[in-house]
């Protein structure tokens, strides 16, 4: 007869504790890169849409992650991750 495998892995942090820590880290990073009024408006939107629920926390985490990713990818002045924009000659001299 088959038996379920025993849980021999390391003890995991509770999901809600981990989620709240992640949200705090994202909020502190977002404050460095976006105007506070934008973040306040986003928080109001999330609260009006989801209320004070875990679904709202998860939605806020997802949106902040997406905003920060795009912000860094476009080329944040504070980061080395962004795309480096290169000026191209318009006279065709760089063509082979």
UniProtKB/Swiss-Prot annotation:
Keyword Ion transport: yes
Pfam families named in the record: VPR
GO-annotated cellular components: host cell; host cell nucleus; host extracellular space; virion component
Subcellular location, record wording: Virion; Host nucleus; Host extracellular space
InterPro entries reported in the protein's UniProt record: RetroV_VpR/X (IPR000012)
Keyword Transcription regulation set for record: yes
Keywords: Activator, AIDS, Apoptosis, Cell cycle, Host G2/M cell cycle arrest by virus, Host nucleus, Host-virus interaction, Ion channel, Ion transport, Modulation of host cell cycle by virus, Phosphoprotein, Transcription, Transcription regulation, Transport, Viral penetration into host nucleus, Virion, Virus entry into host cell
Post-translational modification: Phosphorylated on several residues by host. These phosphorylations regulate VPR activity for the nuclear import of the HIV-1 pre-integration complex.
Region span, Homooligomerization: 1-42
Gene3D superfamilies linked to this entry: 6.10.210.10, VpR/VpX protein, C-terminal domain
Phosphoserine carried by residues: 79, 94, 96
GO BP annotation list: DNA-templated transcription; monoatomic ion transmembrane transport; protein homooligomerization; regulation of DNA-templated transcription; symbiont entry into host cell; symbiont-mediated activation of host apoptosis; symbiont-mediated arrest of host cell cycle during G2/M transition; viral penetration into host nucleus
Chief site of localization: virion
Entry superkingdom: Viruses
Protein task: During virus replication, may deplete host UNG protein, and incude G2-M cell cycle arrest. Acts by targeting specific host proteins for degradation by the 26S proteasome, through association with the cellular CUL4A-DDB1 E3 ligase complex by direct interaction with host VPRPB/DCAF-1. Cell cycle arrest reportedly occurs within hours of infection and is not blocked by antiviral agents, suggesting that it is initiated by the VPR carried into the virion. Additionally, VPR induces apoptosis in a cell cycle dependent manner suggesting that these two effects are mechanistically linked.
Family: Belongs to the HIV-1 VPR protein family.
Note: HIV-1 lineages are divided in three main groups, M (for Major), O (for Outlier), and N (for New, or Non-M, Non-O). The vast majority of strains found worldwide belong to the group M. Group O seems to be endemic to and largely confined to Cameroon and neighboring countries in West Central Africa, where these viruses represent a small minority of HIV-1 strains. The group N is represented by a limited number of isolates from Cameroonian persons. The group M is further subdivided in 9 clades or subtypes (A to D, F to H, J and K).
Subunit composition and interactions: Homooligomer, may form homodimer. Interacts with p6-gag region of the Pr55 Gag precursor protein through a (Leu-X-X)4 motif near the C-terminus of the P6gag protein. Interacts with host UNG. May interact with host RAD23A/HHR23A. Interacts with host VPRBP/DCAF1, leading to hijack the CUL4A-RBX1-DDB1-DCAF1/VPRBP complex, mediating ubiquitination of host proteins such as TERT and ZGPAT and arrest of the cell cycle in G2 phase.
Name of the protein described by the UniProt record: Protein Vpr
Biological source species: Human immunodeficiency virus type 1 group M subtype D (isolate Z2/CDC-Z34)
């Amino acid at each position: 007869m088959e038996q379920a495998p025993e849980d021999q892995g390391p003890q995991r942090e509770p999901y809600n504790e981990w989620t709240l820590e992640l949200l705090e880290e994202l909020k502190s990073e977002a404050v460095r890169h976006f105007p506070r009024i934008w973040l306040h408006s986003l928080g109001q939107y999330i609260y009006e849409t989801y209320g004070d629920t875990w679904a709202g926390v998860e939605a806020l985490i997802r949106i902040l992650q997406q905003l920060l990713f795009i912000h860094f990818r476009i080329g944040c002045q504070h980061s080395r991750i962004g795309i480096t924009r290169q000026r191209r000659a318009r006279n065709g001299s760089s063509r082979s």
